[in-house]
């Protein structure tokens, strides 16, 4: 089950970054006024790590090898049971939308790279490095 990592560096007073983690997923979200504004759902292990990225106004991107959406999303929905309900429902809606639009979603790059704040527990200065902006 995903657990929240606390003390994540906050770089924008108008929004909140949050980080949830388990043994398979890292979920990075940005919320504005409590609403989901962006997320990165990172999954896989080490060299095979991939990410599904969404942000309002930009839409979806997928980093890494092509996504077999149904098993990943099913696994995520089981892991997300402990997330705050409003966030869990918003993420679930976005993931279902992704499944419906999958053919239209471009890949940004073939290998996923984390931003500095996502590698260190969020305590470094992420200026100009965060993909969730």
Predicted regions and their residues:
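Short N-terminal edge-element motif at the start of the domain
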Residues: 1-14
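Generic preference for hydrophobic/aromatic residues in regular secondary structure cores
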Residues: 1-2, 18-20, 27, 59-61
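Intrinsically disordered, low-complexity regions
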Residues: 3, 16-17, 69-73
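Mixed-charge, Lys/Arg-enriched low-complexity segments
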Residues: 55-127, 132
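Amphipathic, interaction-prone secondary-structure segments
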Residues: 11-51
């Amino acid at each position: 089950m995903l657990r929240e990592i606390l003390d994540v560096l906050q770089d924008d007073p108008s929004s909140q970054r949050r980080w949830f983690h388990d043994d398979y997923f890292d979920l990075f979200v940005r919320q504005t006024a409590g609403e989901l504004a962006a997320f990165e759902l990172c999954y896989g292990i080490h060299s095979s790590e991939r990410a599904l990225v969404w942000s309002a106004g930009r839409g979806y991107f997928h980093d890494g090898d092509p996504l077999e959406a149904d098993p990943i999303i099913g696994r995520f929905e089981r892991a997300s049971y402990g997330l705050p309900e409003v966030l869990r429902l918003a993420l679930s809606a976005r993931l279902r939308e992704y499944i419906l639009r999958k053919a239209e979603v471009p890949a940004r790059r073939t290998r996923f790279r984390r931003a500095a704040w996502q590698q260190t527990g969020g305590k470094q200065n992420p200026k100009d490095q965060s993909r969730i902006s």
